[in-house]
Amino acid sequence: MGESGLPSEDELREALDRVGVADVIVQAVSATASLGFRRVSPEARDLAQARLAIECIRALEPVLREGGVDEAVVRDLEQARANLQLAYAKAVSEDETPTGDPSG
């Protein structure tokens, strides 16, 4: 650590050398799924953003698999995407149901 208590430039470089690109992508996909779930919630509904999250996750799943990411991690991300797709479909149907309709 430098005098200011912050890591030095060399320490930061060493830390970056220990992080794999796949690790960063997995974290980004996980965060994308979380944001997607938030965007299907009634409080923060933005179905275009939720759909973008779904499509991005879908696009990166094979890349992560080919990149050697642990299969269990990829399966977890696929399951998160599937759950997000179900939540998205439910949100779309809720938005299509008239508000005063007792069937919705």
Q: Where do the protein language model's features map onto the residues?
A:
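N-terminal intrinsically disordered, cationic/polar leader segments
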Residues: M1-E55, A72-G104
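Amphipathic alpha-helices of TPR/Sel1-like and other helical repeat/solenoid scaffolds
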Residues: A53-E66
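Inter-helical turn/loop segments and adjacent helix faces that build the functional surface
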Residues: G67-E71
